[in-house]
């Protein structure tokens, strides 16, 4: 039996879940998302990815600045939803909102809780060198990602994965998982399990100040740092090009052998020495320029030893 749902989400990560719920026959009474924000060269107001999709589908869209007022609660209740589905909404739900739907509010989280509670689980999993991560559906409570878990799916994390790659994989995996969870909820067969009190870690929001590459770390750590911050905010370093100090973001790389001083360019293929081993740059981006493959970059900006990356 299909459910009547409120969907609450904002970025691209949430769109596949919205589409899967509709494909499985659930009725979306309303979509809650964050307000339009300036973006692009002209800094024009742009609706969120979820808002764009909801408008295309003819679903009512709401962008409240707060959910803490009696009026916001009354409006939320007026939709007559059985449950709410929350995917990267970007606003904390007060207890009154959590209590409003008869069947509860259910969140899709991009980690294997209780590891990486918080804002940046995908980035932190890669940066920490986790061998696997996943997605979980939990019934929300007042804590930070502390609700009872309904379902989970795991995925291996490889050295080749960037945060963007893992984001896209988890978005699709999570959409299928939430559809299965809502089907079980509709049947009355959704089983909930308390989160473990052991292994709790927190995925702090990414700070741009931590994006600078430290070449004095082992090569594998540098790779994880680069991939965990790719494409945003982008791990960066500086190099000298035509007498000018240029900032470059490295978006994708691989670990290779190569002894040298940390930050030293080892060859003409963008191999850079680290404390232990080296990385070979595969994709990068100069400030104000689009991302490009290393080969294309080197065609326009040949680099040869001796030089150093700061």
From Swiss-Prot:
PROSITE patterns: GART
Catalytic activity: L-methionyl-tRNA(fMet) + (6R)-10-formyltetrahydrofolate = N-formyl-L-methionyl-tRNA(fMet) + (6S)-5,6,7,8-tetrahydrofolate + H(+)
Xref: InterPro entries: Fmt, Formyl_trans_C, Formyl_trans_C_sf, Formyl_transf_N, Formyl_transf_N_sf, Formyl_transferase-like_C_sf, GART_AS, Met-tRNA-FMT_C
Residues that, per the record, bind (6S)-5,6,7,8-tetrahydrofolate: 111-114
GO cellular component terms attached to this protein's record: cytosol
Top-tier EC class: transferase
Name the record gives this protein: Methionyl-tRNA formyltransferase
Species annotation: Nitrobacter hamburgensis (strain DSM 10229 / NCIMB 13809 / X14)
